[in-house]
């Protein structure tokens, strides 16, 4: 399954707020948390499978993953030490496109992915154009010194002013660079997801 490229508000109305997916939800939350979800849930009982499916979809759309990519991350998380759900979220949070977003250099993860693809982002002073690149402790995330790169980042930083940089990252606005100084704690995960439901959804596939 390819990455979703359709109307984002359609997804937000169905799944609820997804700040990493689109910034539009901040303008009028009531439109997306309205009667459609409430009425449908009261008229018919949602199966456990559908509950897990919706949670999986939230995670997939928030981080902008294909189905194959998400399944790969779940497989890695299950084979790693520690709670599978927590490890899964940590893996996703350490993606370069997400780090750029969480640093406030882009208004959404898709916008951050575009910056990475266009070679505007440096990791430890080397250009990295792979959005799925897994950042490590001590990695420095900075911006190409070309004028157009700075212009793009400054514009995105203004749009992202409402986003708070999480505690596992530090941002130096003067140098337009950030640092990954620890593994993200569960409470600072960007996506408001019940990761256990996602793990349960994939339990028969992994």
Swiss-Prot record:
Instruction: Provide one Gene Ontology biological process annotation.
Output: ribosomal small subunit biogenesis
Any one Pfam family here would be S4
Xref: Gene3D superfamilies: Ribosomal Protein S4 Delta 41, Chain A, domain 1 (1.10.1050.10), RNA-binding S4 domain (3.10.290.10)
The molecular function terms of the Gene Ontology recorded here are:
rRNA binding; structural constituent of ribosome
Q: Which UniProt keywords apply?
A: Chloroplast, Plastid, Ribonucleoprotein, Ribosomal protein, RNA-binding, rRNA-binding
The record's section on SMART domains has:
Ribosomal_S4, S4
Read off the CDD domains from this record.
S4
Could you state one GO cellular component term attached to this entry?
Answer: chloroplast
Q: Is the keyword Plastid assigned to this protein?
A: yes
Does this entry carry the keyword Plastid?
A: yes
Q: Which InterPro entries match?
A: Ribosomal_uS4 (IPR022801), Ribosomal_uS4_bac-type (IPR005709), Ribosomal_uS4_CS (IPR018079), Ribosomal_uS4_N (IPR001912), S4_RNA-bd (IPR002942), S4_RNA-bd_sf (IPR036986)
Q: Where in the cell is it found?
A: Plastid, Chloroplast
Q: Which residues form the S4 RNA-binding domain?
A: 94-152
Which domain of life does the protein's organism represent? Eukaryota
Q: Which SUPFAM superfamilies match?
A: Alpha-L RNA-binding motif
Q: Which family does it belong to?
A: Belongs to the universal ribosomal protein uS4 family.
Please give the subunit comment from the record: Part of the 30S ribosomal subunit. Contacts protein S5. The interaction surface between S4 and S5 is involved in control of translational fidelity.
Q: What does this protein do?
A: One of the primary rRNA binding proteins, it binds directly to 16S rRNA where it nucleates assembly of the body of the 30S subunit.
Q: What is this protein called?
A: Small ribosomal subunit protein uS4c
This protein's species is: Chara vulgaris
Q: State the organism's lineage.
A: Eukaryota, Viridiplantae, Streptophyta, Charophyceae, Charales
């Amino acid at each position: 399954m390819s990455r979703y490229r359709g109307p984002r508000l359609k997804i937000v109305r169905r799944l609820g707020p997804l700040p990493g997916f689109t910034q539009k939800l901040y303008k009028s939350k009531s439109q997306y948390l309205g009667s459609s979800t409430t009425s449908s849930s009261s008229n018919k009982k949602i199966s456990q499978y559908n509950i897990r499916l919706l949670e999986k979809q939230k995670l997939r759309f928030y981080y902008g993953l294909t189905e194959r990519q998400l399944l790969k991350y779940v497989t890695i998380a299950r084979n790693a030490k520690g709670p599978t759900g927590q490890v899964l979220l940590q893996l996703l949070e350490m993606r370069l496109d997400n780090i750029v977003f969480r640093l406030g250099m882009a208004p959404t993860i898709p916008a951050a992915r575009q910056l990475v693809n266009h070679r505007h982002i440096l990791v430890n002073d080397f250009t990295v154009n792979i959005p799925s690149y897994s950042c490590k402790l001590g990695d420095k995330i900075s911006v190409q010194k070309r004028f157009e790169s700075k212009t793009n980042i400054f514009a995105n930083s203004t749009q992202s002013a409402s986003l708070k940089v999480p505690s596992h990252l530090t941002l130096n606005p003067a140098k337009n660079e950030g640092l990954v100084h620890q593994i993200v704690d569960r409470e600072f995960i960007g996506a408001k997801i019940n990761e256990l439901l996602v793990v349960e959804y994939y339990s028969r596939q992994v």
